[in-house]
C-alpha cells in the first residue's frame, strides 16, 4: 500500500518527537551522572576539613554554588549538650537585624517540624503548619527561600537556610530538592564528625584544646611554614602559668581553683583570634599558638592577656579572688626548629618570669634583638 504524503509527514513528526524525547532523556541522565560526580567531590571535600569554622565556610560556599542561591546560613549547637541552635557567624546574603533573635530551642515546634522533613520546606509551608511566634518571625525576616534540616545518625544537629534562587523561578523542583537533601546529608555527617573531634580534643573545664592536639596542630603549622620555602609567615608561642595557684586551692578550696582556671581561660580566648590555638597544658598552665605573629606582636598579645587577668576580680562564694599570671614567649626563627624546641624556649622564658617576681612577660633569649 502506498504511503500518502500526510502519513509521511506524520511518521516524520513522530520520529522527530521520539528523537527529542530520547535526546532529552540522555541529557537528563548526563546531568544525573554529573550531579553524582559532584556529590562525590563534595563528600571528599567536606570530609577533608575537620576544623569547625573552616567546615561551615566550605559548606556555605558549596551550597550557594551547587544550588545557585544568593545566600546561605547554618544554625548549629555551640556544644553537644547545648539546647539552642544558633546562627553561625559565617553567613552570606542575609541582612542581619541587630535586635532580632537568631537562636531557637531544640524543643521549638519549628525544629520538630523540620525534623519530620527530609528535603526541607518553604516559609509558606512552615506558616501553614506551625504558629509563627517571634522566633519564627525573626527567621522569616531574613527572607529565606528554603529551610533544610541537617541530620546525622537520625539526630537533627542543625538546619540550613537558603537565600533567593539566582534563576527566575523561586521554587525548587523535586529534582533540586533531592540534590538539597543529598548535600544536607553530607554536610550533617561532616559537621557531626567535626563536633566529635571537638569533644575529644577539648578540655571539659576550660573549653580550650588538649595538650596532645595542640602539639599536632603546631607540628602541622611548622611543616606548612617550612614547606612553603618563603619566610613570609611565622608563629609564636605563649606559655602561661597562674601565679601561686596552690595558695588559691588551699585558701578557697578546689572548686574556687576550678573557677579561676575557667575565668583565665576565657580571658585567654577573648584576647586571641580564631586563627590562634589556645590549650590547657596541664594543671594551672596554658599554652597558645599565635599564627603568623612576630615576636614583638606576640609580646603585645601576652601583655594584653597578663593585664586583663590582673584587672579581673573573680567572684567565688561572695568573695573576690584576684590572681596574676606569668608568661613566656618564643617565636619561630625559620631554622627548622622542632615543635618541642620552640615550646621549651617559651617554657624557659616563663621560668624567667617566675624567677624575676612573677606577673610579667618574658621573651625567649633566642628572639631578643642582637646587639
UniProtKB/Swiss-Prot annotation:
It catalyses: 2 GTP = 3',3'-c-di-GMP + 2 diphosphate. Keywords: Allosteric enzyme, Cytoplasm, GTP-binding, Magnesium, Manganese, Metal-binding, Nucleotide-binding, Transferase. GO terms for cellular component: cytoplasm; plasma membrane. GO terms for molecular function: diguanylate cyclase activity; GTP binding; metal ion binding. Shows higher activity with Mn(2+) than Mg(2+). GO terms for biological process: cell adhesion involved in single-species biofilm formation; negative regulation of bacterial-type flagellum-dependent cell motility. It is an enzyme of class 2 (transferase). Allosterically regulated by a feedback inhibition loop. The keyword Magnesium applies. Mg(2+) binds at residues 241-242, 284. Disulfide bonds: none annotated. The record marks 246 as: Transition state stabilizer. The active site is at 284 (proton acceptor). Its EC number is 2.7.7.65. Pfam families: GGDEF. It comes from the Bacteria. Its cofactor is Mg(2+); Mn(2+). It is found in: Cytoplasm. Gene3D superfamilies: 3.30.450.40, 3.30.70.270. Residues 233-366 form the GGDEF domain. Catalyzes the conversion of GTP to cyclic-di-GMP (c-di-GMP). Shows activity under aerobic and anaerobic reaction conditions. NCBIfam families: dguan_cyc_DgcA (NF041606), GGDEF (TIGR00254). Exists as a homodimer and as larger aggregates. Both dimers and aggregates possess DGC activity. PANTHER family: DIGUANYLATE CYCLASE DGCM-RELATED (PTHR45138:SF9), REGULATORY COMPONENTS OF SENSORY TRANSDUCTION SYSTEM (PTHR45138). This is Diguanylate cyclase A. It comes from Treponema denticola (strain ATCC 35405 / DSM 14222 / CIP 103919 / JCM 8153 / KCTC 15104).
Amino acid at each position: 500500500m502506498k504511503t500518502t504524503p500526510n502519513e509521511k509527514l506524520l511518521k516524520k513528526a513522530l520520529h522527530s518527537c521520539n528523537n527529542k524525547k530520547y535526546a532529552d532523556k540522555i541529557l537528563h541522565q548526563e546531568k544525573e551522572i554529573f550531579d553524582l560526580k559532584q556529590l562525590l567531590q563534595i563528600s571528599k571535600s567536606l570530609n577533608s576539613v575537620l576544623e569547625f569554622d573552616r567546615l561551615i565556610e566550605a559548606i556555605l560556599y558549596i551550597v550557594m554554588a551547587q544550588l545557585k542561591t544568593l545566600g546561605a546560613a547554618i544554625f548549629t549547637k555551640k556544644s553537644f549538650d547545648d539546647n539552642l541552635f544558633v546562627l553561625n557567624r559565617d553567613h552570606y546574603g542575609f541582612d542581619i537585624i541587630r535586635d532580632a533573635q537568631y537562636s531557637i530551642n531544640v524543643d521549638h515546634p519549628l525544629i520538630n517540624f523540620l525534623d519530620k522533613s527530609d528535603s526541607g520546606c518553604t516559609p509558606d509551608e512552615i506558616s501553614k503548619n506551625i504558629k509563627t511566634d517571634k522566633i519564627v518571625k525573626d527567621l522569616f525576616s531574613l527572607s529565606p527561600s528554603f529551610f533544610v534540616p541537617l541530620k546525622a545518625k537520625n539526630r537533627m544537629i542543625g538546619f540550613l537556610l537558603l537565600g533567593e534562587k539566582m534563576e527566575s523561578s523561586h521554587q525548587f523542583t523535586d529534582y533540586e530538592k533531592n540534590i538539597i537533601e543529598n548535600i544536607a546529608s553530607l554536610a550533617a555527617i561532616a559537621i557531626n564528625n567535626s563536633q566529635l573531634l571537638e569533644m575529644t580534643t577539648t578540655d571539659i573545664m576550660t573549653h580550650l584544646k588538649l595538650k596532645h592536639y595542640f602539639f599536632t596542630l603546631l607540628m602541622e603549622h611548622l611543616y606548612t611554614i617550612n614547606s612553603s620555602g618563603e619566610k613570609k609567615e611565622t608563629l609564636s608561642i605563649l606559655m602561661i602559668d597562674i601565679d601561686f595557684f596552690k595558695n588559691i586551692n588551699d585558701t578557697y578550696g578546689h572548686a574556687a581553683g576550678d573557677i579561676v582556671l575557667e575565668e583565665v581561660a576565657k580571658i585567654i580566648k577573648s584576647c586571641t583570634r580564631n586563627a590562634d590555638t589556645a590549650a590547657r597544658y596541664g594543671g594551672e598552665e596554658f599554652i597558645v599558638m599565635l599564627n603568623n605573629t612576630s615576636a614583638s606582636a606576640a609580646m603585645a598579645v601576652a601583655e594584653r592577656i597578663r593585664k586583663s587577668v590582673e584587672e579581673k576580680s573573680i567572684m567565688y562564694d561572695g568573695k573576690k579572688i584576684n590572681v596574676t599570671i606569668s608568661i613566656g614567649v618564643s617565636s619561630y626563627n625559620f631554622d627548622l626548629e622542632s615543635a618541642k624546641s620552640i615550646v621549651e624556649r617559651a617554657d624557659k622564658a616563663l621560668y624567667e618570669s617566675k624567677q624575676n617576681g612573677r606577673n610579667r612577660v618574658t621573651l625567649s633569649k633566642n628572639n631578643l634583638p642582637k646587639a
